Amino acid sequence: MSSTVAASTMPVSVAASKKESPGRWGLGEDPTGVGPSLQCRVCGDSSSGKHYGIYACNGCSGFFKRSVRRRLIYRCQVGAGMCPVDKAHRNQCQACRLKKCLQAGMNQDAVQNERQPRSMAQVHLDAMETGSDPRSEPVVASPALAGPSPRGPTSVSATRAMGHHFMASLITAETCAKLEPEDAEENIDVTSNDPEFPASPCSLDGIHETSARLLFMAVKWAKNLPVFSNLPFRDQVILLEEAWNELFLLGAIQWSLPLDSCPLLAPPEASGSSQGRLALASAETRFLQETISRFRALAVDPTEFACLKALVLFKPETRGLKDPEHVEALQDQSQVMLSQHSKAHHPSQPVRFGKLLLLLPSLRFLTAERIELLFFRKTIGNTPMEKLLCDMFKN
C-alpha cells in the first residue's frame, strides 16, 4: 500500500523510470478470437483511447493526471518497487502504479500543457446568450436579486442574463466540487499502511475517508457559489451549519448513483469490523436505500442535483440570519431554475418538478446528530462538527 508523503516535484527515482523500456503492454487477445483488442498499457483494463501518449483506461489516465498536476510523491511500502499493477491490484500501490504509467510511456508534459477544459456551465451560458440552445427559456430572476431597474427592454435582458448567470454559477460549482467514484477509490487507499489489506469504499477506513471527502466537497461546492459567498459571512456559516447533513446526503447519493449500491451503507461485517462504527439500524438502511432508488428511478441529472443542493442550502427560516430576505430570494431563484430546467429537458414529464421537490423531505429522515455519529465520529472524535465545518470553510 502506498501513501502520499509530500506535494512537491515528481521524485527523481520515479521520473527516471520513464526512460526504462515500456514493455509489451497494450494489445491483448480478443475473447472472440477475431484479433487483438486495445488494452490499457498500464493495468490491462479496457482502453478508452489514447491518453498522454499511450492507450490507457480512464482510471489510469485520471490517476496519472492527478498525480502530475498535484505533484504528488508516493512511497512504495513494500520497498521493492515491484508491486503488481493490473486491473485487480492497481489501487494497492500508487508508487508502483505511477512508475508503470511512466514506463508505459505516459508523458508528464502532456498533462502540464493540457488546456483546462471550459466548464460546462460556461458552454451552456454562452449557448443561452447567443440563442443557440432551442430548449432554453427566458429565466425570470427574483426581484430581490435583480433590484430596481428602469422599465423597458434593458431591464428584461438584464433580468434574463442574471438568471442565466445564476444557473451557470450553480453548474460551475457542481463541476468544481464533484467527487467521482474513481476518485474516491483511488484516494481512499492512502489511508492504510498495510499492503495486504487495502482500504476500499466498503472497508471501515474507506467509509470514513469517503464520508470526509464528500463533506469536504459539499463545503467546497457552497464556497464556489458566488451568490453564497456574497452573503454576510455569519449568514454563510449559519446556513452551512444548518444544511451540512442534507448536503452530505445529496452528495453521497449523487456519488453512488453510477455504482450498483452505496458503499456507505455497507453493513459492519462487510466493512471488516463493527468496532468504532455504530451500525445503521435496519430501518435506517432500508429508508436510505429506498431514497437512493427514488433518485435513481428519476435519473436526477447534475443540474437538478445543483438546484436541489441550493434549495437545501438557502433556507430563509434559519434562525440568526442577518439577511433572510436575500436568502429567500436565492431559494426562490433555485426553484425557478429547477422548474425551467425540468420543463426544457424533460417536456414529457410534466410532474417531474414536483417529484424532485418531494425528494427533499427524505433527506431529513436521519438527523444531523445521527449522521455525525455514524459517519464522522471516529474521524473527528470529540471535535464539534461546527468547528470542523468552520475550519473547512475558512481553508
UniProtKB/Swiss-Prot annotation:
Phenotype caused by lack of the gene: Defects in Nr2e3 are the cause of the retinal degeneration type 7 (Rd7) phenotype characterized by excessive blue cones and loss of rods.
Modifications after synthesis and translation: Di- and tri-sumoylated in developing retina. PIAS3-mediated sumoylation promotes repression of cone-specific gene expression and activation of rod-specific genes. Sumoylation on Lys-178 appears to be the main site.
Tissue and organ distribution: Retina. Rod-specific. Expressed in the outer nuclear lyer of the mature retina.
DNA-binding region: 37-113
Example GO BP: negative regulation of cell population proliferation
Coiled-coil regions, chain positions: none
GO molecular function annotations of the record: DNA-binding transcription activator activity, RNA polymerase II-specific; DNA-binding transcription factor activity; RNA polymerase II cis-regulatory region sequence-specific DNA binding; zinc ion binding
Keywords carried by this UniProt record: DNA-binding, Isopeptide bond, Metal-binding, Nucleus, Receptor, Transcription, Transcription regulation, Ubl conjugation, Zinc, Zinc-finger
Compositional bias of kind Polar residues: 1-11
Keyword Zinc (UniProt): yes
InterPro entries linked: NHR-like_dom_sf (IPR035500), Nucl_hrmn_rcpt_lig-bd (IPR000536), Nuclear_hormone_rcpt_NR2 (IPR050274), Nuclear_hrmn_rcpt (IPR001723), Znf_hrmn_rcpt (IPR001628), Znf_NHR/GATA (IPR013088)
PROSITE patterns referenced in this protein's UniProt entry, alphabetically: NR_LBD, NUCLEAR_REC_DBD_1, NUCLEAR_REC_DBD_2
This protein's GO CC annotations: nucleus; transcription regulator complex
CDD domains with a match to the protein in the record: NR_DBD_PNR (cd06970), NR_LBD_Tlx_PNR_like (cd06950)
Domain NR LBD, residue spans: 162-395
Cross-link (Glycyl lysine isopeptide (Lys-Gly) (interchain with G-Cter in SUMO)): 178, 315, 322
Signal sequence range: none
Protein localization: Nucleus
Family: Belongs to the nuclear hormone receptor family. NR2 subfamily.
Description of how the protein assembles with itself and partners: Homodimer. Interacts with PIAS3; the interaction sumoylates NR2E3 and promotes repression of cone-specific gene transcription and activation of rod-specific genes. Component of a rod photoreceptor complex that includes NR2E3, NRL, CRX and NR1D1. Interacts with NR1D1. Interacts (via the DNA-binding domain) with CRX (via its DNA binding domain); the interaction represses S- and M-cone opsin expression. Interacts with SAMD7.
Identification of the protein by name: Photoreceptor-specific nuclear receptor
Species the sequence originates in: Mus musculus (Mouse)
Gene: Nr2e3
